[in-house]
């Protein structure tokens, strides 16, 4: 969807009507897929032989917040989403105003996404050798290296694509490992507190993704507004250009450092 959106908008006229048409097309496709899922999946309800022990909410919350590894996973998920949102959002500005070709966003994002998807498939083979935490850290170090590569030639499309591929490879272990790490935190929580709460741990950890996505989107908007960004202008001020480059180059590094620190705490 992300890769196809801008080319579709351009194809339909690159105006408000084009955005509406693109959104409607995606909505219709989503509706069709949901209907296929609804009419072709049969729910099988398994009645358990014995009713599970009901845990009071207070006791469950106390056990949750005493689980330090759940808190680390909450942070990992949140900052992972923040890094992804910042990289994806600011890249549209970068392609439009720095590379002077908004359509390049689809190429750069596709390069990162394809690399990420390929590596995610082989991560399970690497986990037994390196471990989830170490593999995640190694990948994030590669993300930092990818940003440094991009800094060597900020206006080169080739370098931007190479950097995107490296960044996709680097971030893949985090996306693949964070959910098993949350499951591990549930096992640790049961060992520590004798309270089994898989559902609450995963649900509460997902809050990190919601907060991360919201804060990062709002943060980019505030930063761009603070330097006088105006989307109606064909040419932006020098301050706006500096802000775009600053966020695009250093934003992922900032979040990568935080993620590495969290991984070091996950022992």
What are these regions (language model features)?
Residues 2-17, 214-241:
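Transmembrane alpha-helix termini and helix-breaking/packing motifs in multi-pass membrane transporters
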Residues 19, 101-109, 241:
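Juxtamembrane helix-start elements in MFS-like secondary transporters
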Residues 195-227:
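A late C-terminal transmembrane helix in Major Facilitator Superfamily
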Residues 151-164:
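Helix-loop junctions at membrane interfaces in 12-TM secondary transporters
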Residues 1-92, 96-101, 247, 252-267:
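Intracellular loop-helix junctions on the cytosolic face of multi-pass helical membrane proteins
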